[in-house]
Amino acid sequence: MAGLQGGFTTGACAAAAAKMAAALLCGEAISERISIPLLDGTRESLPLAYAHRLPDGAEAAVYKNAGDDPDVTNGALIIARVVASDKPLEFRAGEGVGIITKPGLALPPGEPAINPGPRLMIESAVREVTDRGLRVTIAIPDGKQLAERTFNPRLGIKGGISVLGTTGRVRPFSLEAVRKTMECSYNVACASGVRHPVLVPGHIGERAAHRHFQVTQEQVVEAGNEWGFMIDLVAQTPPSALLVLGHPGKLAKLPLGHWDTHSSRSASPVPSVRELATRILECPVAESTTVEGVFADLTAEQRQCLGDTLARALQIAVSHRLDHRAPVATALINLAGDMLGSCGDLTPWQ
């Protein structure tokens, strides 16, 4: 988004802190700023929060600055403790950094949630100072609380936040970051043995999935507004069956060809839903500015008819986008989570 200020990832902050700690370990003086190489081939200088020597090593810290991005870790203190090791370079999770417990992520279970990109940045940064064997422990004091506001609990990352970053830079409201999180969720579901996933737009759909069906947390994967991306991702690793569940205010856009359902990038489905309701119900439909309002003015029998018809159109659209690589069922709900209609075989989730 134009005019928004970028920032640095937790991985870049960890690399800067680790470099300063490694420098102290090797007898160098404290610097107010730490210059590090980023994964995009550029360099940046990050301000130091503090640094001091320890009896067996050194510790340094950098405050995370995510710029204008609504990152939950913005302002968090990223701490690196560095001690000598008989291994070339090893990573440990300190306070507030999670441990991976499920397969399907970039690192195996048991490893600290310090992603491959940040590990490369940390290695490049400390190797500018020394070739000695080092143990680098990353800590984020508020990480355990911050992690509750992320996907980490669902991804099986326990005890804290992840140290992330593919380039070292934070791009405000990055679509790439959103999609990466969704991809991780689906990969974890597959690696956990989920064969009947449920795609939902968000929390309303997730709550309804648990209310109406027998599903585990891993089965339910949020697609947000990125339905084209998610269906294409599912097509790469087809499940035994797929359930798409959510509110028709978003999902009725898919049969219209709007696979990015964000309101600023897709047309309102209200006119087409009203036109469909008028045609199949053979009666006037009240004016409304929302799909929820269209359904609210119908009788229970009419709601079921319209809901099932929209669910059928949704099933056809998703099946076509999926290239018919898996059976698709669909279910539509209102904002209260009540069922409006469905299509396809729902027994795998019952």
From Swiss-Prot:
A molecular function (GO) term: cobalt-precorrin-5B C1-methyltransferase activity
Keyword Transferase: yes
Pathway given in the UniProt record: Cofactor biosynthesis; adenosylcobalamin biosynthesis; cob(II)yrinate a,c-diamide from sirohydrochlorin (anaerobic route): step 6/10
InterPro entries per record: CbiD, CbiD_sf
Domain of life: Bacteria
Keyword presence, Phosphoprotein: no
PANTHER family: COBALT-PRECORRIN-5B C(1)-METHYLTRANSFERASE
Protein name: Cobalt-precorrin-5B C(1)-methyltransferase
Record lineage: Bacteria, Pseudomonadati, Thermodesulfobacteriota, Desulfuromonadia, Desulfuromonadales
